Amino acid sequence: MSNGMKLPVVEEFFSLQGEGYHVGKAAYFIRLGGCDIGCSWCDSRYSWKQGNHPFMDVSDIVKKISDFNTDSVVVTGGEPLKWNLDYLCDELKKNNKKTFLETSGAYEMSGTWDWICLSPKKNMPPIKNAYELANELKVIVQDSSDFEWAEQNRRLVKPDCMLFLQPEWSKVNIIIPEIVEYIKCNPVWRISLQAHKYMRIP
């Protein structure tokens, strides 16, 4: 892992959060390159190969954010924890930004975070401390077998962790009714819809 002063940036954009607990809130997004988890339904495959994306100085990344009217910064991927995020978070905090992480939890934690959204993947499950640190658990549901996977993960997070089931986008119309019925029977869960896709924004 590098010292984190340069990071492979796939894209940066200012938009609204579209998933989970903070849906609808304005935020600046930083998508980092590199992911070896390989989810079949991934909607950001273009981010997987880190070599395809230029390394940028963290100072330049942070400087750009000052042009936008938000105090919230979401770091996503790819799998952002492939990289040392300590320096990025330090610089964001110096600029009074709130830091949000979207991760599979498969790699060691780095960085200082105000909110961690853990989205576990079966083919590369989270490490133990990811469960301990998660503020939000978001499980992608492709079919009914994923409800048991969701419950396995729920048992590992903190009691106050927010719990979300999110339909896999290509099957959204098929799987939403199943999620609705599941939540009616298991009301500790909430549904997360990818609102940004409905709004056709990044």
Q: What annotation goes with each model-predicted range?
A:
Residues 1-4:
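Radical SAM enzyme core and accessory elements
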Residues 7-14, 26-27, 33, 38-113:
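Conserved Radical SAM active-site core
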Residues 16-20:
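A short beta-strand-turn-helix
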